[in-house]
Each structure stands twice: as C-alpha cells, then as structure tokens.
C-alpha cells in the first residue's frame, strides 16, 4: 500500500465503509479488498455514533481495481463469508466524504506508533527425526547457549510450504510499512522491522549497538535507526525463519571452545567444499535449542570434528537414557508438589531436561 498523501486522493478509486465489525483491524479490511485488486491504502478510523461498529476507508491502486470492487457490490453491500459491509462509493458522492476522510486518516498516519514492551520472536523449531535440507547462515547469538555448546544458526531451504508462508507475511509487511512512520529505537536483544529498500521491509533483531540480524534470512546488517520501527502484533506470531541448533552428542576439548566462531565459518563453507546440500535431522531438544545431526552426503559433521581431535562424539543411540513412570512425572510436575524421586542432583537435573523436551515435542506436534 502506498502512503495516503500520494494514493488516497486517487479519483474514482475510493470507498467509505460504514459498518466494520468492532473486532476488525486494518488487516481484516485489507484482506477483503485485496481479493478485487491492489489496495493502495486502507484504514479503520473509529467507531460509528452508536459505538457498535467501526468506520473505515479504502483506496484502490487504480480505477480498474476499484471497478472490480464495484462489480461485486450488491445494492451498496459487499457480501462475504460471515460479513456484510455497507460500502459508499466515492465516485457516486462527488468526493463529499474526502475532506472528512483525509483529516481522519492523516491524523492517524502522522501519529507515532503505540508504545509497547520489547518484542522477542520465538526461534523456529525443526521437525523431530525428519531429514531436511538446510543452509548454515550467520550466527544469531543467544543467551540460552552454554559456553561449551557449539551452536549454529540454520535456515531451511527447498521447503515450498514454508517459503510461501513467509513470502505472504513479507508481502503484508511491505504493504503495512508504507503507512507507518519509521525512526524507532530498538533495544539491543529485541526485535523490530527494518526498511532495507524503498518498498521492502524485513523483521530484525538488534544484536549490538551497530548491528541488526535479519531473522528470516540469516544475515547480519548495519543498524540504522531512521529505517526501523516497532514490530506490529500481527507479525509477532510467526517464529523466526532461522533455527538455533546445537550438534548432538559432542563433548568439546576446553582448548577448542575459544575457536567456535572460526569453526562456524568453516562449517558454513562445508557444503560448498563437498559440492552437495547440507542436511539436518533434529533428534532432541535442549531448552530452546534444536539438537541435531548435520551431514552432507555420507559425511557426518560430528565424525569429522572428532577426527580433528577437537571433541568427543557419542551418537544418540549410545547416550545414556533414563526412564520415568508417568505417575512420577505427573507428581514432579504438579504445581506446589515436589516428588521424592531421587537425592542425586544429576538425575533430578536430567529429569527436568526430559520434561522440557516433552513440552517442546508437544509444541512441535501442534504445528
């Protein structure tokens, strides 16, 4: 959508909607009208006199797009699934509504975005025990990563359904960004939106005073306050497209830990050196981290690292497993009740990890 100053006054392309449901916002209205063509501008501007419905304005990108809307009007009503909108065509009223509309819209567009608490998008979970094609991208730092855990940031590739979902989100964000003011301070460690081109915006996390991370593309860019604004709630529900991952079954030599950054750079180029696509398989979870096996053809990264002598590798099939009864888990997880399961601190710690793992797997199944 273009800004109201250039698009809203397009002759014969505007509509006034008089009975927008109270639960609707700009995007509900946008979704209705985009079915007929390109929407230049749309806004829910306030309640009607009786307070039961809202008023709104829509301007299409061209007269041809507006004519498509007109073809679908039935006696001034736009009828859809579970709604009927009363639409006044500006073409038929000689523009008498435009001064009122422009004042309301201009006031809203020039108003600063509402202040809310800092936003932090959730990391993307990988499907359990499923072979997926991935790319190792720029590392996204996380406070949940232990100093001795080698972590990577992965981006799923060749996944048409996921690409379609995120492409749709970015299309909506690009339309929204044409009508909101930028220049908003992002706190370090939190997420917002960055304009990387005149008609293109991206979700970002501020990772330092000077750097931003594109959380759906896996790239680090420079921070520019004048190109940032707060992340609207409608775009907060989707997790980052990148996934925080750790290599499963590795115990690192203390002398290798300071070299993690260098090792990550080598792993990023691993697929190119092997002339093949990297594949990952999540075999478990450690808190918010996907624990994975990473391989390229018949070459397994953990094996290669072990042969370099920088770590020890124990495949998951050989790792110790602990089993607990359903009753014990329920008793331990019951609010306000501590189960007497063991005096061994390591066993208790392991049980807590298992509970976290179960919760994460349930979350994955819901997706």
Swiss-Prot record:
GO cellular component: cytoplasm; nucleus; perinuclear region of cytoplasm; RNA cap binding complex
Cell division is among the record's keywords: yes
Top-rank taxon, per record: Eukaryota
GO MF annotation list: RNA binding
Region (Required for ife-3 interaction), start-end ranges: 298-345
Pfam families according to UniProt: RRM_1
Keyword RNA-binding annotated: yes
Alphabetical UniProt keywords: Cell cycle, Cell division, Chromosome partition, Cytoplasm, Developmental protein, Nucleus, RNA-binding, RNA-mediated gene silencing
Effect of deleting the gene: Worms whose mothers are lacking mel-47 exhibit prolonged interphase between the two and four cell stages of development. Mutants arrest as early embryos ranging from 50 to 80 cells with no signs of morphogenesis. Chromatin bridges which connect nuclei remain present after cytokinesis appears complete. RNAi-mediated knockdown results in maternal effect lethal (Mel phenotype). RNAi-mediated knockdown results in chromosome segregation and cell division defects in early embryos. RNAi-mediated knockdown results in defective activity of the PIWI-interacting RNA (piRNA) silencing pathway.
Tissue expression notes: Expression is restricted to the germline (at protein level).
Any one GO BP annotation for this protein: piRNA processing
Domain RRM as annotated: residue spans: 13-92
Subcellular location: Cytoplasm; Cytoplasm, Perinuclear region; Nucleus
Function: Component of the pid-1 and tost-1 variants of the PETISCO complexes, which have roles in the biogenesis of a class of 21 nucleotide PIWI-interacting RNAs (piRNAs) that possess a uracil residue at the 5'-end (also called 21U-RNAs) and embryogenesis, respectively. Promotes the biogenesis of 21U-RNAs. Mediates the interaction between the PETISCO complex and the PUCH complex, the endoribonuclease complex processing the 5'-end of precursor piRNAs, thereby enhancing mature piRNA production. Required for chromosome segregation and cell division in early embryos. May have a role in DNA replication.
Subunit organization: Component of the pid-1 variant of the PETISCO complex (also called the pid-3, erh-2, tofu-6, and ife-3 small RNA complex) containing at least pid-1, tofu-6, ife-3, pid-3, and erh-2, which is required for the biogenesis of 21 nucleotide PIWI-interacting RNAs (piRNAs) that possess a uracil residue at the 5'-end (also called 21U-RNAs). Within the pid-1 variant of the PETISCO complex interacts with pid-1.
Name listed for the protein in its UniProt record: Embryonic developmental protein tofu-6
Record organism: Caenorhabditis elegans
Lineage: Eukaryota, Metazoa, Ecdysozoa, Nematoda, Chromadorea
